Amino acid sequence: MIDKLQAIEDRYVELSQKISDPNIISNVNEWRKYVKEHAAIEDIVLKYREYKKVLEDIEATKELLSSNDEELKEMAEEELSQLEEKKEKLLEEIKILLIPKDPNDEKNVIMEIRAGAGGEEAALFAHDLFRMYSMYAEKKGWKVEIMSSNETDIGGFKEVILNISGKGSYSRLKYESGVHRVQRVPTTEAGGRIHTSTATVAVLPEVEEVDVEINPNDIKVDVFRSGGHGGQSVNTTDSAVRVTHIPTGIVVTCQDERSQIQNRERALKILRAKLYEMALQEQQREIAETRKSQVGTGERSERIRTYNYPQGRVTDHRIGLTLYRLQEVLDGDLDEIIDALILNDQAEKLKNMNLN
């Protein structure tokens, strides 16, 4: 690992010279490329330099252990213990920094929440999840925009698609993809029996047009009138848009905006995210087959979390984490769960890295 760190530091020094070179500065594209690479490895280099300084301090302190002055010797032993502890802590921090970054972590999010098994109760649970993520986003200072929704008559969601934008949104919310299960007594249940319902959450990175190119010949666009609850007409013009991607069969419908142009733009944005995710999943499948190891399968069919109302309990099945503060979680207090998922993800990735 030390050889790898030294190579990174050497590259950092080289890049520092390049981004100060007037000949390179005059070529904006080349200069930006070097600045980006320089910034990407800066944290590793600074932490490695701190680690090397601690090693020097350890060697200097060890020399004091041979002193005849007992008081000085005792102080040196205490300092050495602290330095060894600091060295181990820095090593762990460096290992985390060496984990390859997810290129999508800086992207915004397109989140799809769909009612699963459980009929109207599942739709109400989908609305609860929508509220939970909206409140979490608010706590984080992220912006939430409903791109498309299909509401039920009693306030649930058959489906709702959100655009969540803000620093770190995808890097934290990506762990929410999967099947969420709720266990509770529905308001419509006269006998007081506990029902189990599900909703699925898909978290996609929002992608730019440059990331995914859509051939205009590959899409079919249909326009129709927006419908309210029970199919009632809420718009007298054909403003709703349905976009079909012919090669994959993906269909996206948007009708929340009054303008056909806005609905079309939103539908294409969602389609781009879906196509990007398909390409990403295919790439990850190939990597998994090659390496014969997987860091979580990410399959949507997996039940990832249970929300148990009678017990006031939330359990994340992927990491065996159980919290008895259901209401706080539903009010958007998700950091404890997400932080634990991130740590677990980092630990799994470190296992698969050769840092010797």
From Swiss-Prot:
Against Pfam families, the record matches this protein to:
PCRF, RF-1
Task: Give Gene Ontology CC terms.
Answer: cytoplasm
What subcellular compartments does it reside in? Cytoplasm
Q: Which residues carry this modification: N5-methylglutamine?
A: Q232
Posttranslational mods: Methylated by PrmC. Methylation increases the termination efficiency of RF1.
Superkingdom in the source lineage: Bacteria
- Give the matching PROSITE patterns: RF_PROK_I
Q: Name one GO molecular function term.
A: translation release factor activity, codon specific
Question: Keyword annotations for this protein?
Answer: Cytoplasm, Methylation, Protein biosynthesis
- Function field: Peptide chain release factor 1 directs the termination of translation in response to the peptide chain termination codons UAG and UAA.
Q: Which family does it belong to?
A: Belongs to the prokaryotic/mitochondrial release factor family.
| PANTHER family assigned | LD18447P
Q: What is this protein called?
A: Peptide chain release factor 1
Which organism's genome codes for this protein?
Answer: Thermoanaerobacter sp. (strain X514)
Q: Which gene encodes it?
A: prfA
